[in-house]
Amino acid sequence: MLDVLIIGAGVSGVSCALILGSAQNKPFAMDKKIAIVAHQKASSLQNAIFNNAYGIPAGKLGSELLEESLEHLSKIYPHVLQIEGEKVLSISGEAGNFSITTNKSTYQAKII
């Protein structure tokens, strides 16, 4: 069973994964199993083009930023499992015992 399953790898999902990943050495987060369903197709950034964002080169595509964010996550926090090529179809259960069904598998998580 996962302790936390993050659904979606848009800006909010990846930010959540980065924050939880960075806490791996904290007493409250040690030995926690964290995963992210790395589906990004619904993110509004998919079609964005950045021209005036601080620190981002002009003409940078949002889809590139999303892809790079997952690469960054896997590089610095490899303990955060990235579930790729799957889309969530349903969620059932209650706090502490959720069942998340994707197009390929079913996952159990305490928190989603």
Cite the ranges covered by each PLM segment.
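Flexible, charged surface loops at secondary-structure boundaries
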Residues: F28-A29, G93-E94, T106-Q108
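Glycine-centered tight beta-turn/hairpin loop motif at sheet-sheet or coil-to-beta transitions
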Residues: T101-S105
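A conserved short coil-to-beta-strand element within the FAD-binding core of flavoproteins
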Residues: E84-N97
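Beta1-alpha1 glycine-rich phosphate/pyrophosphate-binding loop at the start
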Residues: L2-E67, H72, H79
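Domain-scale terminal segments
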Residues: Y77, Q82-I83, K110-I112
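Short hydrophobic core segments
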Residues: L5-I7, T106-I112
